[in-house]
Structure formats: structure tokens, C-alpha cells
Design a protein with these regions (language model features):
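Active-site SXXK
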Residues: 460, 470-494, 507, 635
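Boundary regions of SH3-family modules and the immediately adjacent low-complexity/disordered segments
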Residues: 346-350, 397-427
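Penicillin-recognizing serine hydrolase domain
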Residues: 425-459, 463, 518-666
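Short, well-structured active-site flanking segments
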Residues: 487-505, 525-527, 573-576
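Hydrophobic single-pass membrane-insertion segments
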Residues: 63-76
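N-terminal intrinsically disordered, acidic low-complexity segments at the extreme N-terminus
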Residues: 1-37
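N-terminal Sec-pathway targeting helices
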Residues: 40-55
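Extended, compositionally biased repeat/scaffold regions that form elongated interaction surfaces
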Residues: 74-362, 376, 380, 386-390, ...
């Protein structure tokens, strides 16, 4: 940049700042009377509703003297612009003011995920910019499942959503569903939290500390008397003027009434990255003229233009230009200001509401407690029992849970709960204490030296302990060597010849190490096995310089290999049957662990392994696919650092026998 251009820009910025200061001086309340120049239409509030909602609302709306105007828009959005009767908004005659709650800071300390119900919408509308971080988990209100973000709030309405018109204590009454933005593709409604803050009369400074603009100021600035007027030969919806873009609200005899969006704000709201669905669909029409204020930002005083739109409030910083030479803009944190005004939101929990866990969680005795009644995991179902509690910014639900043979109750963290049911066929996860507290205690007594996973294929349910901890594979690695070799043969368009059949048979049925070494070498050694696991989507394999027997894999990895094999997702039907037949004919002296503790009448496709590990202690494991009548399950039990050979086998026997009895007996 040349020095002349730098001087010109500095002069322009100074002039802009002077104009703002003069406006502040001329308007003591900073905006009860907005500046005459800037902004857009105001009474036409963008409301996205489905066709069904439009039909449901149109008749009573017309009966009440309300004008509805429908605008064609792209994608899944249907926009309805509403002009309230008499030009008044619901908050027009409200005088209430609400001081900030001291409890907001606790929400800022939380790390809430975006609920699966809102993820698709959040991604599509560039939620990282438009909505910001999640400040709460998804929680139930009279509107449905609600999640508050830094800059707004989303709702997934439910069939039980209240249609009551009574103002809720948290401001979330049913009218917001009709004045928000409805996305027909996802069924999500983006709530107009500005409505709530204007109705409450929040006294939080808008734009930054020390700002003279509050939501009380914005409320006053939405009064119809602040509509700007423009002489137009032929009034149109938007008109470019010297001050920006004038958006007409109404027109009569060549005079249009509306608001002007200053160029700096117009540049921001029409940025396709900020508003991928267009400015009206993203922000709604403006409710006010642009208001001037000063605020403390990062310890320095900045001059701002603030403009309220139906769905968001926008501020541009006149003292901070972006790369485009325009003042930097931002969506003001309506969600944060909502929580800062009211504190913990009101939660409405209908008894018996079904939810699912999104990750591993301890179901505890009290909110935030440390005594767990059970450990459940992803996709585990819970039933809400009607109670909830906010604790240090985190929400907890009282829940009931049920497993194969057990049931109980306790408190679950709402941040790990979703209303979205798992995808079809998705399995549920739980700790062993959901199957048997005794087995769970037994496993826990060995700490990190034992890992186990059980997949109850009949009920699509996993139970696990230390499932992601790597253990030395020993001869259980021969299952992966067999599968990867058959895949290699399939890539050549053939099956094993007589010699290869003999090698594979010796490796699996007789656990011949020389046969395993031959297969291992043909596949490229450790790098070949690493490539195999990557190809089938199994993680956690660790190569070892001593060879295939001392390589490591978590119990979950072995479970995934066996599951892919059993479900026919890794080999052709012919090769799958071939592999399982070998595993079903293990020599009698190889039937340890799962093989010697089978339920009566059961069969197993299995592979055990044992080896003195590099530390000189025993690594012993067992794994297999068990079929017992109509029941089928896969079990993996790995041990490490065992000084007693027989004692290590007893661990595998104890777990396999207990699991078999639990899964196959009524």
C-alpha cells in the first residue's frame, strides 16, 4: 500500500468515526432515534415455514388483519414475510426490562457437541459463522428439542410441542415457531431470539462492553415512527441509494417507507460465505435503522454500526477494516445474550421420552455424581423419567435404562444424549456391568492387563472393557493372515491351489507357525499387514520387529475382523465359507478359552494365541464366533503381563463361560 493511499484510508476512517461520534452526541440514548441514513425493511420479518404451517396459519392470520406475503426462494426454504397488524410487533408496547443473570459464565465453560438432530442444518448454513459454538446441549422445551448457540438457537419441533400462546418464563413461547426460519429439508426451526431479548428488554450492552445500545434501545428503535421515507418514481423492494440499500416496507404515491442497510452492513450480510441462502433467508428483513455506538473491544474503544434484523443482529466495526476495505462485520451473540439474561433455561421433560447416548457415559446416582449404576455407550437407549437439573452450566437428566437381564435408573449428562434415534442397523454399546456386574468387577480386578469385547449379534449389542488397548496378538493374528491372503488371491481372480490350501489349513487348524511365516512373507511382512488393516478399516495395529506373533492389536480390532468375516463384508461368499470352515475345525488341543467353555450344543469358529511377550511374561488370548441355537455372539478376551500361564488361561475361561451362560440362558 502506498503512503498516499494509507493517508486517504486513515482520513476516511477518521471521518467515519467522527460521524459516529456526532451521531452519538446528537442522540443521547444512542439510538432511541436512529440516524436518518442507514438501512433496510423492518416489519417484513423473514419466517421460514413449511407448506403445512403456512396453511395452518394463513386463515387465522387473515382473520386477524395480518398481511402475509410469500416470496419464492431456492432450496428447501419457504419464506413468509409478515407485517403485524397496525405495524406493531409483539414487543411494541412492552416496557419490561431484565438485568443480566450472574450465572452465564458457567455456560461458557462447557464443551457441548452439536446435537445430531441439528448437524446437517448447521453444516449447510455455515453454522460456525452464523450460529457459533454450542453453549448448551440439546434440551426439551415446550417448543421441542432446543439447542442454544453463541449467536442463536435451533429447535426440532416434536409432536408434543406445546401450542400454548402463554409466554413461557424463558421467553420460548410457541409463536417463535411461526416467526422463526423453517427448513423443510431438515424440519429445523432457527428461532428469532432477538424477539425474546426485545420482549424481555435485556439491558445487556449490544456490541461490546460500555456500548450505549442495549436491547431496550433496539426495542425502541423498531417503533414504526422510525421508518425512513424515500421518494421513488417507481417504488421497488430494494433500491440502491448514496447511503446503501433502501428496502421498502410499503409504498404510496411515490413515497416508500422502509429502512436503509448501510453499504458496510450490506457487504457483510450479502457475503455468500456468511449467508449461503441469501441475506433475507439468513438474517430476515431489518427491524431498525443502523444505530451508532461505541464499545470496548479488546481493551480499546471502537465505533460500531449496529442493525437489528428479524433473525440476527449485525455489527460492523468502523475502526477495523477487512481485506475488502470494508469494516469487519459480525453476527452478535444472541444466544449468549439470551443465556446471560435468563441464566439456565427452563427444561420441559415429558416422562417416558426416548433418547439415546452419543458416546460412553456413566449413569450416576446424582447429577454430577461419581457413583455409577452402569456404564453405557453409543446408541444405548434411555427413557427420561421427568426430572432434569442444571449443575454448573451442565444439564442432567434423570433416566431409566434396561439391558438384557438388568435395569436401573440414574442421571445422564444431557451433553451425551440425543433425540435422534440411531441409524438402522447401528449397534448399541455398553460396559460389562450392563450385562453382569460380577463379570465387570472381575475384569476390572486385572486393570489394564485384560481387555475384552463381546458382540451379541442376536440383539445387536456390544459389551466392552479396555477394548481399545493394544495387546500382543500371538497366534490370533493368523485369522488376519488368512483373510488378507484370501483377499490377495481374490485380487488375482482365483482361490487357493492345493499347496496354498495345505498352508492355510496348517496355519489355522494346527496353528503351524512355519505356515504362518510363509503367508506373512508372501504378503509383504509387517507392511503388508498394516496395509490390510487399513484397507478393511481396522485401526490400532502396531508392527513389531520380532514378527507377526509379537505385533499388537486392540480387542476391538480383532472383533472387527471377525465381524467382517462373519457378516460377509470382507470376502466372497465362497471364501468366507472356506475361512469359517477352517476355524470350525481347530485341533482339540487348540480348544482353549472360548473353545472349552461353550454353552451346551454350541459350535465355534475360533483362534487362540499364547506367547511369552518381549517382557518375558505371558500374552494369552482367545477369540471366536459362537453359535448356540438361535443365539450368536462373537467374543474376544486378551491378556498381557501374566506371570502364570495357567492363571492367564483361567481368565479367558472365566469370562467366556460367564458370557456364554448370560447370552444363551433365559
Amino acid at each position: 500500500m502506498s503512503s498516499d493511499n494509507a493517508t486517504d484510508n486513515a482520513t476516511d476512517n477518521a471521518t467515519r468515526a467522527d460521524q459516529v461520534v456526532q451521531a452519538d452526541q446528537a442522540v443521547p440514548e444512542a439510538i432511541l432515534t436512529p440516524p436518518p441514513s442507514p438501512e433496510t425493511p423492518r416489519n417484513r420479518r423473514a419466517v421460514l415455514v413449511s407448506v403445512l404451517v403456512i396453511v395452518a396459519l394463513l386463515v387465522p392470520a387473515l382473520a386477524g388483519g395480518v398481511l402475509w406475503r410469500v416470496k419464492n426462494v431456492p432450496s428447501s426454504l419457504v419464506v413468509v414475510h409478515r407485517t403485524p397488524q397496525g405495524g406493531a410487533f409483539p414487543w411494541s408496547n412492552v416496557t419490561r426490562t431484565t438485568a443480566p443473570s450472574p450465572q452465564y459464565a458457567i455456560f461458557a465453560q462447557q464443551n457441548n457437541p452439536i446435537d445430531p438432530a441439528f448437524q446437517a442444518y448447521y453444516t449447510r448454513v455455515n453454522g460456525a459463522v452464523l450460529l457459533g459454538a454450542a453453549l448448551t446441549p440439546a434440551y426439551l422445551t415446550q417448543l421441542g428439542w432446543t439447542q442454544v448457540f453463541a449467536n442463536g438457537a435451533l429447535v426440532a419441533p416434536t409432536q408434543s410441542s406445546s401450542s400454548s400462546s402463554q409466554q413461557a418464563a424463558d421467553g420460548l413461547d410457541s409463536s417463535l415457531l411461526h416467526s422463526g426460519q423453517f427448513d423443510s429439508a431438515t424440519g429445523i426451526v432457527r428461532l428469532p431470539l432477538l424477539d425474546v431479548l426485545l420482549t424481555l428488554g435485556s439491558t445487556i450492552p449490544v456490541g461490546g462492553d460500555d456500548s450505549s445500545v442495549t436491547y431496550v434501545s433496539l426495542r425502541a428503535a423498531t417503533d414504526p415512527s422510525h421508518l425512513a421515507h424515500l421518494q421513488l418514481a417507481q417504488p421497488t423492494e430494494t433500491t440502491e441509494t448514496a447511503d446503501g440499500i433502501f428496502v421498502s416496507e410499503s409504498a404510496s404515491h411515490g413515497t416508500a417507507a422502509g429502512h436503509t442497510i448501510p453499504t458496510s452492513i450490506w457487504t457483510y450480510v450479502t457475503n455468500s460465505t456468511i449467508a449461503p441462502d441469501g441475506w433475507q433467508d439468513t438474517f430476515g428483513n431489518p427491524l431498525t435503522e443502523a444505530l451508532t455506538t461505541t464499545a470496548t473491544i479488546n481493551g480499546a474503544s471502537h465505533h460500531l454500526l449496529v442493525q437489528a434484523f428479524a433473525l440476527a443482529t449485525v455489527a460492523v466495526d468502523l475502526d477495523d477494516d477487512g481485506d475488502d476495505g470494508q469494516p469487519t462485520g459480525s453476527v452478535l451473540p444472541l444466544g449468549r445474550d439470551y443465556l446471560e439474561t435468563l441464566g439456565p433455561p427452563t427444561v420441559v421433560v415429558p416422562t417416558g421420552t426416548n433418547v439415546w447416548l452419543t458416546s460412553n457415559a456413566a449413569i450416576v446416582d446424582t447429577p454430577g455424581g461419581s457413583v455409577a449404576s452402569v456404564h453405557l455407550g453409543q446408541n444405548s437407549p434411555l427413557a427420561l423419567s421427568g426430572q432434569s437439573q442444571w449443575l454448573s452450566g451442565a444439564l442432567w437428566y434423570a433416566t431409566n435404562w434396561k439391558s438384557l437381564k438388568l435395569s436401573g435408573s440414574g442421571w445422564a449428562p444431557a451433553s451425551q444424549v440425543t433425540m435422534t434415534s440411531p441409524a438402522k442397523g447401528a449397534a448399541a454399546w455398553a460396559g460389562f456391568d450392563a450385562l453382569s456386574p460380577d463379570v465387570a468387577k472381575y475384569l476390572a480386578s486385572f486393570g489394564k492387563n485384560v481387555g475384552s469385547v463381546v458382540f451379541d449379534m442376536t440383539r445387536n449389542q456390544y459389551y466392552s472393557y479396555n477394548e481399545t488397548t493394544p495387546f500382543v496378538l500371538a497366534s490370533s493374528s493368523k485369522v488376519s493372515l488368512m483373510v488378507s491372503y484370501l483377499l490377495w488371491l481374490e485380487s488375482q481372480g482365483r482361490g487357493p491351489n492345493a499347496s496354498e490350501n495345505g498352508t492355510l489349513t496348517n496355519m489355522i487348524e494346527h496353528s503351524d507357525n512355519n505356515a504362518a511365516q510363509l503367508i506373512f512373507d508372501r504378503l509383504g511382512g509387517s507392511s503388508g499387514q498394516t496395509a490390510f488393516y487399513k484397507k478393511i478399516g481396522v485401526t490400532g495395529y502396531i508392527e513389531n520387529s520380532y514378527g507377526w506373533g509379537w505385533a499388537s492389536l486392540p480387542p476391538l480390532g480383532q472383533m472387527q475382523v471377525l465381524t467382517l468375516l462373519q457378516e460377509g463384508k470382507v470376502l466372497t461368499a465362497h471364501d468366507r465359507a472356506y475361512a469359517l470352515n477352517l476355524m470350525n475345525h481347530i485341533e482339540a488341543d487348540q480348544h482353549m478359552g472360548v473353545g472349552e467353555t461353550l454353552p451346551p450344543g454350541a459350535t465355534v469358529a475360533m483362534k487362540d494365541g499364547w506367547v511369552p511377550a518381549p517382557d518375558g511374561l505371558w500374552a494369552i488370548n482367545t477369540s471366536g464366533i459362537v453359535t448356540a441355537g438361535n443365539e450368536m455372539y462373537i467374543i474376544v478376551v486378551y491378556t498381557a503381563h501374566q506371570s502364570d500361564y495357567e492363571g492367564a488361561w483361567n481368565i479367558t475361561r472365566h469370562v467366556c463361560k460367564a458370557v456364554g451362560q448370560l447370552l444363551t440362558t433365559p
